[in-house]
């Protein structure tokens, strides 16, 4: 018997280290149904097998009690949303309260006394159980900022602790599964330092949704990508940096969920001819036909935009952008989604969060690649692959250019580049210049050298592409995506500045048709931040970043170092979703005493009395 238990334990350990049991957390907004025509989405339009957790955004608050935003939510949308669990009994649903437009004042009032918090908690349990939700998501943007007093940082912790205590007590009394508790948090370092005690949040919450997007947008004077996977060492604005920062501060990796947007941020260019990354911008581009927000396009709107646009790929950020005339959009597509999914698996994070499910191409009518083309990629890599008996899809994936460490060994990047690629039609077929063919099981070695989150550095030499069992010297820049065709923009081999490539015949070629700019004196990227809840109708910029523009469209990473990680690729299957095993196993945690206060210096002091006062000055409202 003990041998059987030992074997089962070993299997579970190996499964954990293989990255299994990833969460795919998807938000659905209660204003999705109000979009016109084919963009109007109701809960019954959603695929219940795509995500492990669905979160309904948002509930509101009245008189320190959680309430539905309107009667339609409670009478129609809540029941329809939770009815999805009849089709997938492993699906978990949560109700989120807050959001950008919600502000902070009602949170502050509710948090201010123990009696107010008790009243709120009782209303939460009642509402969740009445409508068959499995948990609560706290979307408080942000404790200690935007008009919230500094002591909200600690009263927010008290609320979370008291919610968890009440959820456990209710579960014991009713013999029902305990209600889940999650929170959406900023990925921007100065907001994290002001608003959160990371270790306590990591101990108490079931999972933490890191908002690792909205890192650049039309509130800035130069173009930048909304959600780059990686960035240069001097620039903390990337998804990888945000996730590593939370982990460095003590949050458990398995509880950290990386936020990924199904929308793009747009800019209006000063000059149509100056249309690269860090090009001068004069504001937001035109609103989308369905979302109707300047500076913002849902993915299903981006599919229409890129038909007549020129599409580009940012090699060191692993994300695309497109421009048409004076309009510019940075966004995520199926390729960048796959890179982000593999980054999550490789780094053993808890999973991915999608904002939002309803901004993907829900019915497959806009992009021509089937329903949910973005979220399907994430599901395929994070959820379905874990239970598949076939070999997992793999490809070369570089490590992060930047990390949360300031170790100079890990910040040895002085150059970066981008490479333009041809437009990819929504049908999934790649536009190529000479070669047009579908390549599967292709291994790509990126032409850059970059810094890893660990201290491992590897310099790449030749550009190689492995097809099956063969390895060849490439004569072109080759890209492949899961379910997409490969592209060969030209017949000449392009070599980054500072590297040489040996081709047959011992000829050495350097890049043709690309400008390379050495940023040895450091390239400064925007350091401002605009905090929003994407998709809401009022977006308020916080602060105005200052940037030093880089006047190029393409730069070369000759001095970068990189640790390649070997994976394989496979073609995406169609959107027939297979049932999955149990999605989540929640750990038991020890609840600390409610009579504590955590100071900014990390000291723990006892609190007395029911009311909380603080002598700490209010932090400037820099968002």
Swiss-Prot record:
Residues 1-21 form the signal peptide. InterPro entries: Chitinase_II/V-like_cat, Chitinase_insertion_sf, Glyco_hydro18_cat, Glycoside_hydrolase_SF, Glycosyl_Hydrlase_18. Glycans are attached at residues 402, 441. Keywords: Cytoplasmic vesicle, Disulfide bond, Fertilization, Glycoprotein, Signal. It is found in: Cytoplasmic vesicle, Secretory vesicle. Disulfide bonds join 26-51. GO terms for cellular component: extracellular region; transport vesicle. Its main location: cytoplasm. Residues 613-623 have a biased composition (Polar residues). Residues 539-558, 594-623 are annotated as: Disordered. It comes from the Eukaryota. Residues 22-385 form the GH18 domain. GO terms for molecular function: chitin binding; chitinase activity. One of its GO terms (biological process) is single fertilization. Chitin binds at residues 71-72, 98-101, 142, 211-214, 355. Oviduct. Belongs to the glycosyl hydrolase 18 family. Binds to oocyte zona pellucida in vivo. May play a role in the fertilization process and/or early embryonic development. This is Oviduct-specific glycoprotein. It comes from Papio anubis (Olive baboon).
């Amino acid at each position: 018997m003990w041998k059987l238990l030992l074997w089962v334990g070993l299997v579970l350990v190996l499964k954990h280290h293989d990255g299994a049991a990833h969460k795919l957390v998807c938000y659905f907004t209660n204003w999705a149904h109000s979009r016109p025509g084919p963009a109007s989405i109701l809960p019954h339009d959603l695929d219940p097998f795509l995500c492990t957790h669905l979160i309904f955004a948002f509930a509101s608050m009245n008189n320190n009690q959680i309430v539905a935003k309107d009667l339609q939510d409670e009478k129609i949308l809540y029941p329809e949303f939770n009815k999805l669990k009849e089709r997938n009994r492993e699906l978990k649903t949560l109700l989120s309260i807050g959001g950008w437009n919600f502000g902070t004042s009602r949170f502050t009032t509710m948090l201010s006394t123990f009696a107010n918090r008790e009243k709120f908690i009782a209303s939460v349990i009642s509402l969740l159980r009445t409508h068959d939700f499995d948990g609560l998501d706290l979307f408080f943007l942000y404790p200690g900022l935007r008009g919230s007093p500094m002591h909200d940082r600690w009263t927010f912790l008290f609320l979370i602790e008291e919610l968890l205590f009440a959820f456990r007590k209710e579960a014991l009394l009713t013999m029902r599964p305990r209600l889940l508790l999650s929170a959406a948090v900023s990925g921007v370092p100065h907001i994290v330092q002001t608003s959160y005690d990371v270790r306590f949040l990591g101990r108490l919450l079931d999972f933490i949704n890191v908002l690792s997007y909205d890192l650049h947008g039309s509130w800035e004077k130069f173009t930048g990508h909304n959600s780059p996977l990686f960035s240069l060492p001097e620039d903390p604005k990337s998804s990888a940096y945000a996730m590593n920062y939370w982990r460095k501060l003590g949050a458990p990796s398995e509880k950290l969920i990386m936020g990924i947007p199904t929308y793009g941020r747009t800019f209006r260019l000063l000059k149509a001819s100056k249309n690269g990354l860090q090009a001068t911008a004069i504001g937001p581009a035109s609103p989308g036909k369905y979302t109707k927000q300047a500076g913002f396009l849902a993915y299903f709107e981006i599919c229409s935009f890129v038909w007549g646009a020129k599409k580009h790929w940012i090699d060191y950020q692993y994300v695309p952008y497109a421009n048409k005339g004076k309009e510019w959009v940075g966004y995520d597509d199926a390729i960048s989604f796959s890179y982000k999914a593999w980054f999550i698996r490789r780094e053993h994070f808890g999973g991915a969060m999608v904002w939002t499910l309803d901004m993907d191409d829900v019915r497959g009518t806009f992009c021509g690649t089937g329903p949910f083309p973005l979220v399907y990629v994430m599901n395929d890599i994070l959820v379905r692959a874990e239970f598949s008996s076939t070999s997992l899809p793999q490809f070369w994936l570089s490590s992060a250019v930047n990390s949360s460490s300031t170790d100079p060994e890990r910040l040895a990047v002085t150059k970066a580049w981008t490479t333009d690629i041809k437009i990819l039609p929504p049908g999934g077929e790649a536009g190529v210049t000479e070669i047009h063919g579908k390549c599967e099981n292709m291994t790509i070695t990126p032409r850059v050298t970059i810094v890893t989150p660990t201290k491992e550095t590897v310099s790449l030499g030749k550009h190689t592409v492995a097809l099956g069992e063969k390895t060849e010297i490439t004569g072109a820049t080759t890209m492949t995506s899961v379910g997409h065709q490969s592209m060969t923009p030209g017949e000449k081999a392009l070599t980054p500045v500072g590297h040489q490539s040996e081709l047959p015949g011992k000829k050495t070629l350097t890049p043709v048709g690309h400008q390379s700019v050495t940023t040895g004196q450091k390239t400064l990227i925007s350091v401002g931040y605009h905090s929003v809840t994407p998709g809401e109708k009022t977006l308020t910029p916080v602060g105005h970043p200052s940037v030093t523009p880089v006047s190029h469209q393409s730069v070369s990473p000759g001095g970068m170092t990189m640790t390649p990680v070997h994976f394989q690729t496979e073609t995406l299957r169609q959107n027939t979703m297979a049932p999955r095993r149990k999605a989540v196993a929640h750990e038991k945690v020890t609840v600390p005493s409610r009579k504590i206060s955590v100071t900014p210096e990390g000291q723990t002091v006892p609190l007395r009395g029911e009311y909380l006062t603080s002598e700490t000055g209010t932090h400037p409202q820099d968002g």
